[in-house]
UniProtKB/Swiss-Prot annotation:
The keyword Phosphoprotein applies. Expressed in spermatogonia (at protein level). Expressed predominantly in ovaries, where it is restricted to growing oocytes, with greatest levels in fully grown oocytes. Expressed predominantly in testis, heart, lung, liver and muscle, and at very low levels in the brain, spleen and kidney. Expressed in bone marrow-derived macrophages and osteoclasts. SUPFAM superfamilies: WD40 repeat-like. Residues 90-134, 175-216 are annotated as: Disordered. The gene is Tle6. The modification Phosphoserine is found at residues 139, 187, 209, 519. SMART domains: WD40. This is Transducin-like enhancer protein 6. GO terms for molecular function: structural constituent of cytoplasmic lattice. Transmembrane segments: none annotated. Contrary to other WD repeat Groucho/TLE family members, does not contain any identifiable Q, GP, CcN or SP domains. Only the C-terminal WD-repeat domain is conserved. Keywords: Cytoplasm, Nucleus, Phosphoprotein, Repeat, Transcription, Transcription regulation, WD repeat.
């Protein structure tokens, strides 16, 4: 690089080396800080309108009462050390007749007529910031903290740069008014100075007033507000998780609220930019371990009942997500097969699309067991007949239809209202290990490595596509026409369910894939298998976002419909992960 020399005192010359290096270091830091600055601005601007509106209302009240400044100036007393303290100032109001004696004038000064209080509402002091774990509203019975001076030099709600500027303009205007009234007779001040011994009556705090210190939008700094929005309602401790595959340390149980198990779109305070950031996750944080103590086959999570269901051969254990313990060994319920026989055991379970019904099927059972989750207590509602068949896959539709895939290749359909068999679809042996229902089509895949599409209107196979390896898992995108397959050779394949001639291999692993599931928005999917990892992929490229190691092969997993929790089953334990965006 060619070097240039020029006197540092020359106007318009090259900066000295010390200033130049400092300038370059600042420029290099700009890209790193740009993202956080933009996010902070978005968070702060979202709350600035209501805050500024309240502020300008206060200024407007001040401008309408020119004598309010003089009365507030008399409300400041000076102590022995020069400090100021708040003191009560009475407001004179027309009483309907002229007062002629000095005693009556003093009595009038000591009274606060109700009409005057309505005409001149007082500014409320803002208590110091607190650290609430969740945003709450104060009741009318909450006690006030010690009152602060009316004119607070640094009010707690002025933390942003824009509001700080408005406050400075207001203080400048106040100082000018004080200078204009500085030549007035001081006898009036000495006359009312004795009133400083009176303390203001505690006023109840209103829920939307600036004195509500529990409101995080009023008491937090911009950086604290950014953290408030970035944290989940569950309030987990932030834990960085890189895509290198390092596992998060097991944390203490989290105290999440109902928002974790409810759709974020249903929350009235959710803004558009908050929804957009729930596109792809950044990490998984383990928050709980459920000790099932038997080899897990299937796990399911219900946002409706806020429970996790872990299925093994002997039965299904029900765990309450509200209980906050790091390692839970005591389930709420244990649902067992009604038939007690060594040759009878469960193989799979499934939650209905509305999370109100639990299905369970297995080997040598007389029927698929149906439990009613909407009832006050769990009970076996009915059994869907399938005697002599071994169930290995379950599915259901919103039209009160239940489906099951059996080892002999049969796909059976029941009407849940009558528990009667609607139709049997006969396929090759071991061809119905996986079931996916989409519109009027049933997609099946199994150990014969063939993907089949059954048309429910004609009750026959409309498509067969052969893959290179056995189909171990199936999942359909909730937003697009892509069907995702997990193969025994470790491949992820995307199959276009509408065009039916487009197959994309998007990722390859060294181990068998045992489970796949799309996110609710269809922007990513998660996969588990024999590789001892939970892997998160982006859609549609299949790029690996990050991995989370488990203690052993992950046979099964499930995800809540709002994309907030993932439940995995590895060996004899189920792990609850909080998805961090």
């Amino acid at each position: 690089m060619t070097s240039h020399r020029q006197s540092s005192d020359t106007f318009g010359g090259i900066l000295p080396s010390t200033l130049s290096s400092r300038y370059l270091s600042i420029v290099n830091q700009l890209p790193e800080e740009f993202s956080s600055v933009v996010s902070e601005m978005m968070v702060h601007l979202e709350n600035i309108f209501s805050l500024a509106e309240n502020f300008f209302q206060a200024i407007e009240r001040f401008s309408r009462t020119p004598d309010l400044l003089e009365r507030n100036k008399m409300s400041i007393g000076v102590g022995a050390e020069g400090d100021s303290w708040p003191c009560h100032v009475s407001h004179e109001a027309p009483m309907g007749s002229a007062q002629t004696t000095e005693n009556s004038a003093k009595e009038e000064d000591k009274q606060v007529p109700e009409s005057a209080a309505l005409q001149h509402p007082k500014f409320k002091s803002t208590p110091g910031p607190q650290l609430p774990t969740r945003r709450r509203f104060l009741s009318e019975s909450d006690e006030l903290q010690d009152p602060q001076p009316v004119w607070d030099a640094e009010p707690q709600f002025c933390q942003g740069f824009l509001i700080q500027g408005l406050w400075e303009l207001f203080m400048d205007s106040r100082q000018k008014n004080q200078q204009e009234h500085g030549g007035e007779d001081s006898s009036q001040e000495s006359k009312d100075s004795g009133l400083c011994d009176f303390k203001p009556e505690p006023q109840p705090r209103h829920r939307n007033s600036l004195s509500d210190s529990a409101d995080p939008f009023l008491i937090k700094s911009p950086s604290a507000l950014l953290d408030y929005y970035q944290e989940d309602v569950s309030r987990p401790q932030p834990e960085t998780q890189e895509s290198s595959g390092r596992a998060d340390k097991f944390l203490k149980p989290l105290s999440w609220g109902s928002e974790v198990l409810e759709s974020s779109c249903n929350q009235p305070s959710t803004a558009l930019w908050q929804l957009e950031r729930f596109t792809v996750p950044q990490a998984l944080q383990k928050v709980r371990v459920l000790k099932h103590q038997e080899l897990l086959l299937v796990v399911a999570v219900s946002s409706f009942t806020r429970h996790v269901f872990t299925c093994s051969q002997s039965g299904i254990k029900v765990w309450n997500l509200v209980n906050q313990v790091a390692e839970d060994r005591d389930p709420e319920s244990h649902l067992k097969c009604s038939v007690q026989d060594n040759k009878v055991y469960l193989r799979t379970c499934l939650l209905s699309s509305n999370s109100r019904t639990l299905f369970a099927g297995g080997y040598n059972l007389p029927g698929v067991i149906v439990w009613d989750l909407a009832a006050p207590s769990l009970y076996e509602k009915c059994q869907l007949p399938c005697e002599g068949l071994s169930c290995q896959a379950l599915a259901n539709t919103k039209e009160n239809m239940a489906l099951a895939g059996f080892t002999d290749g049969t796909v059976r359909i029941w009407d849940l209202r009558t528990q009667e068999i609607v139709r049997n679809l006969k396929g090759p042996t071991n061809s119905a290990r996986n079931l996916v229902v989409k519109d009027d089509n049933i997609w099946t895949g199994g150990l014969d490595a063939c993907l089949r599409c059954w048309d429910l209107r004609m009750a026959k196979v409309s498509l067969e596509h052969l893959f290179q390896s056995q189909i171990m898992s199936l999942a359909h995108s909730p937003t697009e026409d892509w069907l995702l397959l997990g193969l025994a050779n470790g491949q992820h394949c995307l199959f276009n369910s509408r065009k039916r001639d487009q197959v994309l291999t998007v990722d390859t692993k060294d181990n068998t894939i045992l489970g796949l599931k799309f996110s609710p928005n269809g922007k990513w999917w998660a996969s588990v298998g024999m590789g001892n990892f939970i892997t998160v992929h982006s859609m549609p490229t299949g790029a690996k976002l990050f991995q989370v190691p488990e203690v052993g092969p992950v046979r099964c997993f499930d995800m809540t419909e709002n994309g907030r929790l993932i439940i995995t089953g590895s060996r004899d334990c189920a792990s609850v992960y909080h998805i961090k965006y």
